[in-house]
Amino acid sequence: MALKELLKQRVMEKLNFSQEISDEHLKGVIQEEIMKISEEYPLLLSDKIRLNQEVFYALRRLDILQDLLEDDSVTEIMINGYKNIFIERQGKLHRYPGHFSDNEKLYQVIQQVASGANRMVNERNPIVDARLNDGSRVNIILPPISIDGATMTIRKFAKEPMTLAWLCEREAFSEEIAKFLKILVRARYNIFISGGTGSGKTTLLNGMSNCIPKDERIITIEDSAELKLNGIDNLVRLEMRNANAAGENQVDMKELIKAALRSRPDRIIVGEVRGEEALSMLNAMNTGHDGSISTGHANSCKDMLKRIETMVLMGVDMPVEAIRGQMASAIDVIIHLGRSFDGSRKLMEISEITGMAASQVALHPLFEMNEDDELTMRSELCDQKKLKEYGQYEACLLYTSPSPRDS
């Protein structure tokens, strides 16, 4: 038996699991058993320190994942069965040399994560979204859905407040773009953020949300809470609830948006629109809640419009032209994110919705990528009414003239 497993077994034999066990007590028992084992097996000081940490993590934390969770350079952790762990650093994927001791240990960690988020995961409910205490987002898939063993994906979020300046430092966009985004938020433009999986939609949503004036009443709606708004006292956070084992007590995004509208919000922020709740979000934007923000999966600003149209049709039989009219009056600006060739997350496109043209939603490009892969200003905002109404017009005039279009 490996020393780690031997130590773990002896520690567990010493503990009384019928009583609450503090971290301090557990660490004391581990240290005591390490001293005993070192009398049987010669151990270096470095071995004792390593065993102490590994056994504590195995019994109280998330085992081999704990070091990765505490490593700020790791942004994503992917577990494909107990033997295969991959991590993302600076947009690049790497295979992690460590792995779980066996399938049983992986399942223990999965159940620990799920129960900590009040989620149930089993064969009857094999796909679960959850979050860790630090806000990291977790997706779990169990066999037989996951053919080669249980999988768990953990998307971490920065511990420091995510601001537009923070994103500038990581070269997601320039300071000029950051100033423009702040103006859009301050002037209460309704904004949709689009992008693929892992493109940074939630991170940008966090950064933009932290530009909201501190005296407003904000309601956030998410499937798994991960937004971190700082300095807003009048903040209400709502989270979707999955159905229980009997298929009851579900509270979906559509219901949460309906509840939010009755709670006198200044703005509503929806973490991600995925289905028929898209119509509820459009209604919220159309009924006096200017400055609302949401995100969705799409490949471009134009594709985001098609996606919203499809999502609305998932819940209601409504003429397509009527849906497009709702979008044209509800959404002011769409911001698209993507990944560049080196894997880094970038802001790729900003477009303004200017109304309807020939039964289509009219998109007016404000910023686009040029031939040098740089985000370049193409045009000023057409609708500047909100800029003037909310005192942001002068700030917007500080920008230089738009660049001529590439030929």
Question: Each predicted region: which residue ranges?
Answer:
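Conserved small/polar residues in nucleotide/adenosyl-binding loops
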Residues: 399-406
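Conserved P-loop NTPase
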Residues: 328-398
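Conserved, well-folded catalytic cores of nucleic-acid-processing
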Residues: 10-17, 36-40, 58-65, 80, ...
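P-loop NTPase nucleotide-binding module
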Residues: 127, 136, 156-158, 163-228, ...
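Switch/coupling sub-region of P-loop NTPases
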Residues: 188-191, 207-330, 336-338
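Switch/connector loops and helix/strand junctions flanking conserved nucleotide-binding motifs
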Residues: 85-88, 227-230, 302-305, 342-348, ...
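P-loop NTP-binding catalytic core
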Residues: 71, 84-187
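N-terminal accessory targeting/assembly segments
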Residues: 1-121
